Amino acid sequence: MADKELKDIEQVAQRVADAHGFLHIDDKTAQLMALDAQIAQAGFWDDAQRAQTVSKQASSLRDTIDAYNAAVSLLHDARAAHELAGEDP
C-alpha cells in the first residue's frame, strides 16, 4: 500500500512540476513584481482607469501564483505525511 501511495505522490509531483511550466509561474512572478513596482510609484493612483487595469492584472497573476504555491505546499505536506506514516510501527 505504501508503494502505491508513494507512486501516487510522485505522479502528483510530476503534474505540479508540469503545471509550473505551462502556467509560466516564473514569468508571472516577474510580471507581478513589475506591476507591484508600478503600483508602489508615486502618482500611480492619479489615473484611476489605468490603476484599476494594472491592479486587476496584478490580482489575476497573484491568484494564479497563490494557487500554484498552495498545490506545492499540499504536495510537501503529502510527502511529509507519507514519511511520517512510514516511521510508525
Model-inferred region functions:
Residues 1-89:
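Charged, heptad-repeat coiled-coil alpha-helices that serve as long linker/dimerization "arms"
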